[in-house]
Amino acid sequence: MMIAAVTAAALLSCDKTERPAALDGEGMIAVTIVDTTGTFPGSTQGVPSVIGEAKVSLQARTHEYSAGDESGEDGVAEFDGLPAGEYSVFARREMPIGAQKKVFTGYTDMLVEGPGLIADTLYVSTVTVNALMINEIYYCGSNYASFYFYDQYVELYNSSEDTLYLDGCILTRNFPTVEGDLEDIDHVRAIYAFQFPGTPVTGREHPIYPHQYVVIAADAIDHSRYSANGYDLSGADWEFFNAFGNDYDVPNVPNVLNINPDRTTDFMINLSSNAIVLATGEEWHIEEYINSSGYPGTRVTLPLYTVIDGVEYAANSDHTKELTMRVDAGFAGVGCAKYSGASVERREVGVDTNNSTFDFVLIPRGTPGYTHVQ
């Protein structure tokens, strides 16, 4: 099932200013969560309707600080005792609809300059998210001394109570060069595209059970034998394998196969910034292009309607977007250092608002096959 709606939250953000020098701890923030789409039960389109029981998270952008609250019947969530600085406020409220979820979500940036109350309204919009999602991406590498990054992996998760199927699904690493306006392009382009065996959409040979984690490793071996900080991926469920190159095929681990004959390397994920996309695999084609050096190349193109989930990550929050906001409105992994062994994982299991700034957190060690959430 595909993404049917996108996050288009009205952002009420403050202008950039110099970082406040004092951490006074006497600031207050109050946000009122409001829907104007008419989608929330009992609401009317165009008429503001407050949303209670929304989970609201506060994340500092200028220092280490985070907090959570739930909006009351009046739609208000409050945070006090705040040091001066810049903050991002995220809100969400979920409503299950079969195998999908309707999520009311939005965020805004706010500036606390000192003691006193800062109040704002956070307008949410709706997204429909899929039960099958990308739960974790480990990409940054584990050993700076040896530049070791071969222990990369992607983890999927089934957040529903139903058995889903991976047959024919495609995992891609996004083509990094943006051509034209991302929001006017109805497809994603991939520099790497690897496909699960089976028939897309209708296949029933490769299940992912309710609340199951599935790990796809670049190389399904024990990397701690080669890097002191490396991951043991010998128990991975799947392995990326490129039959068009000299890739080593680990016995007894099923393969997710490269579909572009012109790409002869393994599924290598950029160590700093890029995007990983999961698609149904029901439609794709290989297209030719001319690279920045004037040489021809090929890439895989997938229609946007086939996208199940996508996660964009970047070490810097001001990185240029490479994935349309219709798939991911934010960035995971801000602040992630190369070869640190850190990973990005969903903040809460099964929570997807199509905004990785909110959905993902940076964790010091990856959790292949399980989650850091207690």
Task: Specify the residue positions occupied by each region the protein language model found.
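Structured interaction patches on ligand/partner-binding surfaces of diverse proteins
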Residues: 94-120
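Short, acidic Ser/Thr/Gly-rich low-complexity loop/linker segments typical of extracellular
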Residues: 61-77
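C-terminal motif of bacterial Sec signal peptides marking the signal peptidase cleavage site
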Residues: 10-13
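Short strand-edge motifs at loop-to-beta-strand transitions and within beta-strands
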Residues: 77, 118-120, 214
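Activation on beta-sandwich/Ig-like modules and their edge loops
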Residues: 15-51, 90-92, 100, 123-341, ...
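Short Pro-Gly-centered beta-turn/loop motif in secreted/extracellular proteins
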Residues: 78-86
